[in-house]
Amino acid sequence: MTWNVWWRFGPWQQRQQALGAVLAAQAPDVVGLQEVWIEEDGRNQAAELAADLGHHWATTTPRFRDGLAFVNAVLSRWPIEATTAALPRADGTPSHRQALLADIDAPFGRLTFVNTHLDFAFDASATRVAQAAELARLIADRRSDPQEAFPPVLAGDFNALDHADEIRLLTGATAPPVPGLVFTDAWPVGGDGSPGYTWDPANPHLAEATWPNRRLDYLFVGWPRPKPLGTVQRCWLAGQSAVAGVVASDHYAVVADLRIG
């Protein structure tokens, strides 16, 4: 599962309850969250949501401004070992965007789960291309034997349409940055045939969105992989309905079932 939880925008306190309710209903084994808040004096949104689920959690390294940080998080039913990696700008210099590289001690073996949030600007495709290429390199360095092990999962808010260069280079629609590593996009494999918009004008939080009707959030499964491990069995959206009068986030979540044996 992946979900951009919209930091502390809008009615964030009411939304926190709605986020928890949606997560409880979906009961994901592993979820990547973006735009997670942490207070410098200790309160941590990821920790609170994980506690409600009974999950382990990890976040990217927080950088505080005015007492608050904006991070990516992974919540998991199983123990996590995680590190933070900085992602580049188009010119190769470090940006403020990060990836959380998590190794999860799952009952079916080690699961490499990478959660990220790429640059958002409409005209920043070149930056997102550099960031996607770096993600591929990081995953290639970290993955287990692709002929034997469960494949890596890449999740996040990519702020890009599926025909954009940054997505095409991950899915093998153009030359991949790391030969021998591409990713299956879970939605066209396991979705319901709809566009799968996660940035949808039906969401009341997007009443004034500049460019709605977009699928910005993705779950990717690494390839090559030993069939049938990692095969997408089903993919769906979550978080579309209001909980106690509030929709949980401005993005809808993407959830998938993967074959584990």
Spans of model-derived segments:
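Structured beta-strand-rich core segments of catalytic domains in phosphoester-bond hydrolases
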Residues: W12, V30, Q34-F120, Y218, ...
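Alpha-helical scaffolding within the catalytic cores
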Residues: Q17-A18, P88, R97-L100, A202-H205
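Metal-dependent phosphoester-hydrolase catalytic domains
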Residues: A140-V153, A160-G261
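Short glycine-/acidic-enriched loop or helix-start segments at secondary-structure transitions
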Residues: D41-N44, E48, S125, H163-E166, ...
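Charged helix-capping and loop-helix junction motifs
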Residues: Q16-Q17, Q45, R128-A136
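Active-site beta-strand/loop signature of hydrolases that rely on acidic residues for catalysis
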Residues: M1-V5, L19-G42, L75, A102, ...
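A short secondary-structure junction signal
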Residues: A85, V114, A124-T127, D165-I167
